[in-house]
A protein has these predicted regions:
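Conserved SAM-binding strand-loop segment of SAM-dependent methyltransferases
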Residues: 2-7
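A conserved structural/catalytic subdomain of Rossmann-like adenosyl-cofactor enzymes
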Residues: 9-10, 14-233
Length: 233
């Protein structure tokens, strides 16, 4: 069920275009997303603010609103609103994987919209892991990016904890650049190591203070660091 539209909403609906929630009343077990990096949500401000003020936590944006120049966390709140009920509430729960730049992790002082959203996610024990990816993976930007794993069905050993995986050296230099994309993560084909499988194992094993040397990572790029870590905190 693919829907074309503006996920956040503008309050200006038009034919063939879903303005706001394109899947009202629906919930999903798994969700993947790569929202735009650092894009302002000024066109959606009135619609989103009205939903926040009118519905609070019964709507999509109850925990707070980020600053106007970056709407990334609004997309995450939208996806969280689409989660299946947690197992302890009689449901099967959901898991979200979303790719962000560093802004949703670091911007916003205590009490700001970004800080309140992060606090709400962590206090409700939904942040399962953050995976730091290599830079230069995207065509239009060379920045470092991060995968957030968000879920309401944590395994018992993960409850109250967040796994941090530093995978910034899991990269393979490409022979030919494509815009700003100069690296890719190896998948075991074309003579590359299987970086994707290695990161998946680190995530699945949930071991504390795992350290891998550059030789073990098998990168053809001179890394800034001589180690990569998987940490649980």
């Amino acid at each position: 069920n693919i829907v074309f539209g503006d996920t956040l909403g503008t309050g200006k609906p038009k034919e063939g275009f879903a303005d706001g929630d394109g899947h009202p009343g629906e919930h999903f077990h798994f969700m993947l997303a790569n929202p735009p990096f650092g894009v302002e949500w000024k066109p959606e401000k009135d619609f989103v603010t009205k939903e926040h003020d009118t519905f609070g936590f019964k709507g999509r944006f109850g925990p707070g609103l980020p600053r106007i120049n970056d709407g990334a966390l609004l997309f995450l709140l939208h996806m969280i609103s689409k989660m299946q009920p947690a197992p302890e509430k009689g449901g099967e729960g959901s898991r979200i994987a979303v790719v962000f730049n560093g802004s949703p992790l670091f911007t916003g002082d205590a009490g700001s919209g970004e800080s309140n959203i992060r606090r709400w996610i962590i206090e409700n024990d939904m942040l399962e892991a953050v995976i730091g990816l290599p830079d230069q993976l995207f065509y239009n930007t060379g920045i470092y990016t991060y995968v957030w794993i968000v879920t309401n069905r944590k395994a018992a050993q993960r409850k109250g904890r967040v796994q941090l995986i530093n995978a910034t050296d899991f990269a393979w230099k490409m022979k030919k650049s494509l815009g700003d994309k100069r690296k890719r993560m190896g998948d075991g084909t074309d003579g590359t190591p299987d970086h994707l499988a290695a990161i998946t194992r680190l995530y699945g094993d949930f071991a504390k203070d795992v350290r891998k040397t550059v030789a073990e990572i098998q990168t053809n790029i001179d890394p800034k660091r001589d180690q990569t870590k998987s940490q649980c905190v």
